[in-house]
Amino acid sequence: MSFSILIAIAIFVGIISYYLWIWSFWIRKGVKGPRGLPFLGVIHKFTNYENPGALKFSEWTKKYGPVYGITEGVEKTLVISDPEFVHEVFVKQFDNFYGRKLTAIQGDPNKNKRVPLVAAQGHRWKRLRTLASPTFSNKSLRKIMGTVEESVTELVRSLEKASAEGKTLDMLEYYQEFTMDIIGKMAMGQEKSLMFRNPMLDKVKTIFKEGRNNVFMISGIFPFVGIALRNIFAKFPSLQMATDIQSILEKALNKRLEQREADEKAGIEPSGEPQDFIDLFLDARSTVDFFEGEAEQDFAKSEVLKVDKHLTFDEIIGQLFVFLLAGYDTTALSLSYSSYLLATHPEIQKKLQEEVDRECPDPEVTFDQLSKLKYLECVVKEALRLYPLASLVHNRKCLKTTNVLGMEIEAGTNINVDTWSLHHDPKVWGDDVNEFKPERWESGDELFFAKGGYLPFGMGPRICIGMRLAMMEMKMLLTNILKNYTFETTPETVIPLKLVGTATIAPSSVLLKLKSRF
């Protein structure tokens, strides 16, 4: 037998041994959980759009308990739904769990010039978070409220026309048009409403329907060839659409920069408040000195390499792209679930309409009036408890071996929260856990956050930076609809909802009627 054949056999045996070693990781640790298949683990369970992977977590939690282990290709993941464990990882030991679970397709967050805030880690994450946070402050939201109002008016006009014809409406489709319209104007330089004629909507839908498909499964199994995989799979529909969208964002940002430069040369002062996130990100500055270059295990410390106090061109593109994806999907889904629950609970809808009539008597709803709609906020929070959207993205990566509640977690281990089970845990929420009960929030949400039992937008320092914007959009639209209409079910309404999805859990449709109140 030739030496080259022996080398080939040795390499083959080494590869097989490595994958079997990873696959048996939790067995050797004595941690129970679904084993799946060698090489794959259970990664193939998360690629079926008709059977959401996040709901697989819930099935396994019922079988294995609130803490169990899985492998996803070469990734080792601990799935948790114990609220104390969640709080420990996301809040108390944040310095040990400040990274996120990433795939080879996403690239190295420390080298990617367009790394979004959601994927960044360490001091780069701190810098991006500090620079981006003012963009989502109440002060900034006031500045862009006019943009949201325009889309609200356009959607209500469309709903008025459709409801007058007695149609059963798929509210999910209407809400997707609404959120895409806002994002187009805020992030893509869109100058007017393109609702129901937006060419970008199908591109974004493709990303969400195919975004966690076999491309991500293969990259999870063979991460060592990540760069090659990114080049090979760039032609797949979901990744090609992502590239197309980033090109559009580049054009919009370049156009804005050219306009600013021309105005400056002509001595023209900026007029009015920023109307979109392109302006807000371009204006982002910080008086804080940032540092980079620290070793991962010394995240809490700083070294002396100073970096920019403003966002670069590529960083703005990265933030706009993720804002587009996250803002489109999660807000549309939250609105859909809220509308469905109101339609199936008319007594709660009536109570909410009474609050809307009392606090917003005038045709125009103001920013300050939104903050007075306490029961509406309870309704949305309860909808997000019953239908948490993004279990698969509620994850962290352990970057320093540590001990959590008596369990050793090795560096490199992923932590994924089974949010669905957590939000439906009777030990946290009581025996009425499966009931739609907005009143449970009337005393505030601090108790549930402190328990680690509620994370619709994540938890801890990495909590979703855009949650205020999402709440503003939802409250503004629902208020304007409920001032004039009542959601009603029809014989076509699917009860209970059929749930689908990959990265998020979505209803296949939300078929309702709108009945005029006047």
UniProtKB/Swiss-Prot annotation:
- What is the protein named? Putative cytochrome P450 CYP13A7
Q: Where does heme bind?
A: 464
Q: In the UniProt record, does the keyword Iron occur? A: yes
The UniProt entry, under SUPFAM superfamilies, shows:
Cytochrome P450
UniProt entry keywords in alphabetical sequence: Heme, Iron, Metal-binding, Monooxygenase, Oxidoreductase
Q: Which cofactor does it need?
A: heme
Q: Which GO terms describe its molecular function?
A: heme binding; iron ion binding; monooxygenase activity; oxidoreductase activity, acting on paired donors, with incorporation or reduction of molecular oxygen
Family to which this protein belongs: Belongs to the cytochrome P450 family.
Q: What is the lineage of its organism?
A: Eukaryota, Metazoa, Ecdysozoa, Nematoda, Chromadorea
Enzyme class comes to oxidoreductase
Q: Does the keyword Ribonucleoprotein apply?
A: no
